């Protein structure tokens, strides 16, 4: 009668307990990997947000300045269409003041601050001021 109840009470073969152990090991591995991935993802999200929060003020000021420069040149170009130099400068400004040109790593220190004024923006501020002097004063 003891043989009849052996499998009910867990006194089965070695292979069954080995299979259970392998299943538990596999399940543990899956959970560990998932936990690791969750931790990495959460860390990336948190650091990405922190980087965005730190860099946004600088980026927004630069973006505003670029918009102001391009907008001024476009307005002047619309009124003074015969000025070929203005047209050429506008095309150059639109290339040089693209986001990927203005927001390059080399322009910023480790704290994401500019060391002084942005050289490309400074160049175009002077050019735009020249056109403002020529046409608006």
Curated annotation (Swiss-Prot):
Region deca-GX3 motif, annotated ranges: 35-75
Record's keyword terms, sorted: Cytoplasm, Nucleus
Source taxon at top rank: Eukaryota
GO molecular function: protein-macromolecule adaptor activity
Cellular-component GO terms for this entry: cytosolic [4Fe-4S] assembly targeting complex; nucleus; Yae1-Lto1 complex
Coiled coil start-end: none
Region (Disordered): 1-20
Pfam families named among the record's database cross-references: Yae1_N
Single Gene Ontology BP annotation: protein maturation
Cellular location(s): Cytoplasm; Nucleus
Oligomer and partners: May form a complex with LTO1.
Membership in a protein family: Belongs to the YAE1 family.
Function: The complex LTO1:YAE1 may function as a target specific adapter that probably recruits apo-RPLI1 to the cytosolic iron-sulfur protein assembly (CIA) complex machinery. May be required for biogenesis of the large ribosomal subunit and initiation of translation.
Matching PANTHER family: PROTEIN YAE1 HOMOLOG
Protein name per its UniProtKB record: Protein YAE1
């Amino acid at each position: 009668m003891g043989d009849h109840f052996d499998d009910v009470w867990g006194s089965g073969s070695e292979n069954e307990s080995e299979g259970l152990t392998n299943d538990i090991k596999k399940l543990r591995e899956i959970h560990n990997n998932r936990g690791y991935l969750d931790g990495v993802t959460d860390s990336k999200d948190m650091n990405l947000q922190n980087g965005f929060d730190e860099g946004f003020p600088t980026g927004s000021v630069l973006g505003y300045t670029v918009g102001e420069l391009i907008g001024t040149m476009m307005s002047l170009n619309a009124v003074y269409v015969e000025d070929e130099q203005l047209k050429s400068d506008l095309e150059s400004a639109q290339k040089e003041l693209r986001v990927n040109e203005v927001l390059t790593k080399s322009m910023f220190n480790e704290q994401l601050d500019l060391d002084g004024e942005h050289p490309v923006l400074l160049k175009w501020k002077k050019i735009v001021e020249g056109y403002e002097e020529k046409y608006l004063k």
